[in-house]
Amino acid sequence: MKVVFLEDVKGRGKKGEIKEVPDGYANNFLIKNKKAEPATGKNLGAVKGRQKAEEKAAAEELAEARKLADFFANEKTVVELTGKSGTDGRLFGAVSTKQIAAALEKQYQIKIDKRKMELNQPIHALGYTDVPVKLHREVTAQLRVHVSEG
C-alpha cells in the first residue's frame, strides 16, 4: 500500500515522503496512529500544497536573514556596552552573549537569541569586537560590539 508520511518514522520514511509499505503495517500502525495516510489523489495534492508552503516560508526566512546580515554589515551598526575596567583596559567581569542580545534589542529593536551568537569566550577587554551571529543555516553575519568605560 502506498502511504504519505505525516511525520518521520524511524527506518521507514520522512515527513512528506510517499512510499510503498506492507498493507498490515500501514493499516494497523501508520494510519491508526496518524503517522501516515493512504496515498490517494486528494492526499497527494494536499502534501504538494504543504510542501510548497514550507518552501515559500523557508525562502522568506532566508531573505529575512540576509536582510539582517546586510544591516549588521553596515559600519554604523554597532552595539554599545559599558563596563568598569582596570588601568590596563581589562574589564572587571566580562560581557556575555546575553548582555549583547539585550543591548541589541534595546538599541535597534532586533531580538536575536543569545545562543545564535557564536562567541567562544566572553569579552574581557575594552574596544571593538566582531561577534559572529548565525542568523540561518546558510547565513552568518558579523555584529560589531563596542565596550567602553562606564
Curated annotation (Swiss-Prot):
Q: Which GO terms describe its cellular component?
A: ribonucleoprotein complex; ribosome
Q: Which UniProt keywords apply?
A: Ribonucleoprotein, Ribosomal protein, RNA-binding, rRNA-binding
Q: Which InterPro entries match?
A: Ribosomal_bL9 (IPR000244), Ribosomal_bL9/RNase_H1_N (IPR009027), Ribosomal_bL9_bac/chp (IPR020594), Ribosomal_bL9_C (IPR020069), Ribosomal_bL9_C_sf (IPR036791), Ribosomal_bL9_N (IPR020070), Ribosomal_bL9_N_sf (IPR036935)
Indicate whether rRNA processing appears among the record's keywords. Answer: no
| SUPFAM superfamilies xrefs | L9 N-domain-like, Ribosomal protein L9 C-domain
Highest taxon, organism lineage: Bacteria
Give any single GO term for biological process: translation
Q: Which residues form a coiled coil?
A: none
Return one GO MF term. Answer: rRNA binding
Function, as annotated, reads: Binds to the 23S rRNA.
Q: Which family does it belong to?
A: Belongs to the bacterial ribosomal protein bL9 family.
This protein is called Large ribosomal subunit protein bL9
Question: What is the species of this protein?
Answer: Leuconostoc mesenteroides subsp. mesenteroides (strain ATCC 8293 / DSM 20343 / BCRC 11652 / CCM 1803 / JCM 6124 / NCDO 523 / NBRC 100496 / NCIMB 8023 / NCTC 12954 / NRRL B-1118 / 37Y)
Q: What is the lineage of its organism?
A: Bacteria, Bacillati, Bacillota, Bacilli, Lactobacillales
